[in-house]
Every structure is written in C-alpha cells, then in structure tokens.
Amino acid sequence: MRIAVFMGGTSSEKEISLKSGEAVLESLQKQGYDAYGVILDERNQVSAFVDNDYDLAYLVLHGGNGENGKIQAVLDILGKKYTGSGVLASAITMDKDKTKQIAQSVGIKTPKSYRPVEEIERFPVIIKPVDEGSSKGLFLCNNKEEAEEAVKKLAKPIIEDYIIGEELTVGVLNGEALGVLKIIPQADVLYDYDSKYAKGGSVHEFPAKIENKSYKEAMKIAEKIHSEFGMKGISRSDFILSEGELYFLEVNSSPGMTKTSLIPDLATLKGYSFDDVVRITVETFLE
C-alpha cells in the first residue's frame, strides 16, 4: 500500500500546506507506511494525481483548488481514495457566506452580515475574503472609510459585526468532537495569519477554561456542523463566546497540521498524539 501526501498548491496558504505536509509525511514514514510527498504547483495540479502511483491520496492542501472541491472531483473521476471531505462539503465550506447561510438555516447563531458597506449598522466590523483561510486578508474596520478601503482590496469580501469575546475552536475527528481550545493572541487584537503561525503569536489554552455549559454547547454545535455539511475525517469549527452566547464563525475542512496548528493540540484532549491522528485518518479512508 502506497500513500502519496499531496501538499503545496497555488493558494496563498501554500507555505502552511508545505509545513503540514512535511509533518504528516514524517509521521507516516516513522510509523512504517510506504509514503512519499508530492508538491503541487500551477503546472501539475491535475497531472500529479494521474501520473503518480498510490493507493491513498493524503490531502494536506489548504485553500484554493485543494480545499474547494476541485481536486476532490479529479480524484473522484480517477476512482482514487483520498482523505478528507468530498466535493460538495469542500466546495460549500470554502465559501464562508454560503456556510453561514446554511448554519443559520439549522438554528446556529452567527455574526450579522452586511452587503454592501452602506448597509453597515454599527462599527467596528470584520471584513475578510469569502474563500480564504488562515485569516488571510482579515481587516478590522472602525468606520465607513476603513471599510470601503478594505472592500477594495478583496475580490469577494464578507462583512460581519465584530464581536468582542473569547476565541474558541473545536476539532472534530470522524464525527466526534475532540474538545474546545481557547486562542489567546499575544500581539494583535485579531487572531490573524501571524498570530496563527508565528512562534509566540498566540497561546493555546486547552481545554478552554470556560463555563461547562458553553464548552458542551460548542462541542455539540461543531459535531452538528460536521454532520450537516456531510464532512469527513477532520474538521475544525471556530467560534466567538461573548456574554455567554456562542457565535459560529466558519468551519475548516482541511485544518493545518503544523507544529503550531490547533488540531494536534485538540487531539491531546482525547489522548491522541499527532501520529495517532495521522494513523486514524489513513485507516478511516482506506476502509
């Protein structure tokens, strides 16, 4: 059995994908799997899946075609087994606006959205790309002028109320919530790209020191999101806890697996090591 770890790609999250892919590949090889890495770029986004010999495609791709369902569609056409969510779940959850609409339709509370800028009822607001991850292109705007400038910088912006509260994230593995982690940024008000991936950018408190009721509710909602969207393998849902109310922000169908990523920390709450998560993922998608 051969496992090809696909990483890289052409999205703005390429560097994180490479780091995640290297960590996963190292774990697989350490555990005795016949695994090798394949780095994707603009020239081989389809051919790499056709030309390589593998029984399982371990996808460690963040953003762009690696997370929006397109590569999953290629693998479906080829009849290849691959890790993670399928075409539909990947495509929908990559679009933050559609994700919010569906979440709201099943009774999950989210921050209020505006479009266009003229509709904003109060400031500050958060403006972010509708289809980027890793908090890329995230703006905190305190007035209309700042909002208009932020919107100009983004191809497809989404505008939301900025809710002050505790930033939480919940990992789900094969439908079961791993636990709740609180993110405490050390430098910036926002949990942006640098806070996520720079050493010392943030502190991860796990399990999150919040009321038991909120902890259980976050776990329940994350599992519901995983199920409602038809997600498979690993997902990670982000929330803001403000005055006892949980607000769902977004769900990630292909969360980072670097040494500073959130899923490895969350996995320890269930007694899983990084290697355990990788092994469970392989076993799940080879069935």
Swiss-Prot record:
Domain (ATP-grasp): residue spans on this chain: 98-283
Residues engaged in binding Mg(2+) 1: 238, 250
Cofactor(s) listed: Mg(2+); Mn(2+)
Location of this chain's protein in the cell: Cytoplasm
Annotated positions binding Mg(2+) 2: 250, 252
Residues engaged in binding ATP: 124-169
UniProt cofactor note: Binds 2 magnesium or manganese ions per subunit.
Keywords: ATP-binding, Cell shape, Cell wall biogenesis/degradation, Cytoplasm, Ligase, Magnesium, Manganese, Metal-binding, Nucleotide-binding, Peptidoglycan synthesis
Catalytic class of the enzyme: ligase
GO molecular function: ATP binding; D-alanine-D-alanine ligase activity; metal ion binding
Taxonomy, superkingdom: Bacteria
Keyword Lipid metabolism: no
This enzyme's EC code(s): 6.3.2.4
HAMAP family in UniProt: Dala_Dala_lig (MF_00047)
Cross-referenced NCBIfam families: D_ala_D_alaTIGR (TIGR01205), PRK01372.1 (NF002378)
Stated role: Cell wall formation.
Entry protein name: D-alanine--D-alanine ligase
Species: Fusobacterium nucleatum subsp. nucleatum (strain ATCC 25586 / DSM 15643 / BCRC 10681 / CIP 101130 / JCM 8532 / KCTC 2640 / LMG 13131 / VPI 4355)
Biological classification of the source: Bacteria, Fusobacteriati, Fusobacteriota, Fusobacteriia, Fusobacteriales
